[in-house]
Every structure is written in C-alpha cells, then in structure tokens.
A protein has these predicted regions:
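Transition segment at domain starts
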Residues: 13-49
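Extended low-complexity, serine/threonine- and proline-enriched intrinsically disordered segments
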Residues: 66-76
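Short strand-edge motifs at loop-to-beta-strand transitions and within beta-strands
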Residues: 89-93
C-alpha cells in the first residue's frame, strides 16, 4: 500500500499501485528523526477487533501536535480513523472473518508517517 500527500492541501491518496499525480509525494514511514516510542503504532488483534495505540508511550494530543489519523491495511483493503486534539491516540477497527492485518500506520502532523 502506498500513501501520497499533496504538498499544499495535505490531502491524502492511498493506492495499492504507484501513482504519478502532480503535487503529490509519497510518504515513507519511519523516516523522520523523532521519538519512536511516541510515534510507532502498537496494536493487538482479539475477537475480530484491532486495537491500536500510537506509541508505547502515549503521543501528545494538542492542536499544535497530534496524531491526525490511524490506518490499518489488510488483505482485504484498508480502514482509516481520524483523531482530534481533544481525544486520545487510540482507536479500534473491526475486522471481517479471514481479514488479516498487513500494516498499521499513524500520521503525526509534525513528524510524518509511522508504521508498526
């Protein structure tokens, strides 16, 4: 799965194929020099639910510095949850029978894309 972001609008495109769209650059996970313990998603799957916490140490959530969204990619597609500054960096995703997690991503507004 490839994730692209528009450099001006910050719009995101998710694609299973490589894209060449003007104004969009591919986001590469875990390439920013920042505290991994606050950015790398941690997840567990139980009873058809994937529970995701961003960071082994909770990521701060303020208007200036927050996790904007969390995404899981699976053998059947992907799901995204958007977070807000007044919430916590934790989300849950329901999985279908036979659906397997392939990747878990978190996007920090200051430090970019992170993958478990």
């Amino acid at each position: 799965m490839k994730i692209y972001q528009n450099q001006n609008s910050k719009q995101i495109i998710v694609s299973k194929d490589e894209l060449n769209v003007e104004g969009f650059v591919e986001l590469i996970a875990n390439t920013t020099d920042a505290a991994q313990e606050k950015h790398v998603p941690v997840y567990e799957v139980r009873c058809g639910k994937a529970r995701v916490s961003v960071g082994s140490v909770g990521h701060p959530m303020s208007a200036e510095h927050l996790i904007e969204w969390v995404m899981v990619t699976t053998n059947q597609g992907y799901q995204v949850k958007y977070l807000s500054a007044d919430g916590t960096p934790e989300v849950s995703f329901s999985l279908s029978a036979g659906e397997k997690i392939e990747g878990v991503y978190a996007y920090c507004n200051l430090h970019g894309l992170w993958k478990a």
